[in-house]
Amino acid sequence: MSHRDTLFSAPIARLGDWTFDERVAEVFPDMIQRSVPGYSNIISMISMLAERFVQPGTQVYDLGCSLGAATLSVRRNIHHDNCKIIAIDNSPAMIERCRRHIDAYKAPTPVDVIEGDIRDIAIENASMVVLNFTLQFLEPSERQALLDKIYQGLNPGGALVLSEKFSFEDAKVGELLFNMHHDFKRANGYSELEISQKRSMLENVMLTDSVETHKARLHKAGFEHSELWFQCFNFGSLVALKAEDAA
């Protein structure tokens, strides 16, 4: 059962950096629905991408799986034999709940739920990789290496789904979408105090990039094609494709 997010409804004397701890994990479904515009659309459409890209006898990786929403979405639309999903997160609280969620929905495709660092996981025989609001929590200097590893581990014709909060090179557009995102949170019942305190905790650990920066990294990693397939305000998702004739 999901609980309502009231973590920041009262003043907090000392705001530390954001962590995905037990308190966050408990309210995460409510928090992300009320904080990330378009989240449900991205999750549901990831299953459509899975239907197009997952191949028999291959693996799917959900890197930074949190409670397993993307994993479950992918698994619903795998209709091939001998596939496996590998879901990884470094938060013990998230992984504990993720295992429960995965176990609650029976399906023929097995899921390995792993507590670990996505930077240390080998990517092998992958037809699809999902980074759903995960890359933004890595140090910027570590992002290219992860994308390089994903590209190398993808089979020819494979796809990476990369969902992120974006910054914008056009400051005027960035300000507009930033303010619209805050309007979205207010409309979903968050107070000014809640919005401010959460932002203060996130500002040192969630460092956003522009769509142009993401595309440049993907190209450098080797992806021949990448494009934004979904956006709502300053949140969105790109799909990057490895060529079918790639070595």
Curated annotation (Swiss-Prot):
Domain of life: Bacteria
Enzyme Commission code: 2.1.3.-
Pfam families linked to this entry: Methyltransf_25
GO terms of biological process kind: tRNA wobble uridine modification
GO molecular function, one term: carboxyl- or carbamoyltransferase activity
Catalytic activity: prephenate + S-adenosyl-L-methionine = carboxy-S-adenosyl-L-methionine + 3-phenylpyruvate + H2O
Keyword line: S-adenosyl-L-methionine, Transferase
Cysteine disulfide partners in this protein: none
Family: Belongs to the class I-like SAM-binding methyltransferase superfamily. Cx-SAM synthase family.
Task of the protein: Catalyzes the conversion of S-adenosyl-L-methionine (SAM) to carboxy-S-adenosyl-L-methionine (Cx-SAM).
Subunit text: Homodimer.
PANTHER family assigned: CARBOXY-S-ADENOSYL-L-METHIONINE SYNTHASE, TRANS-ACONITATE 2-METHYLTRANSFERASE-RELATED
Protein name: Carboxy-S-adenosyl-L-methionine synthase
Species per Swiss-Prot/TrEMBL record: Shigella boydii serotype 4 (strain Sb227)
Gene: cmoA
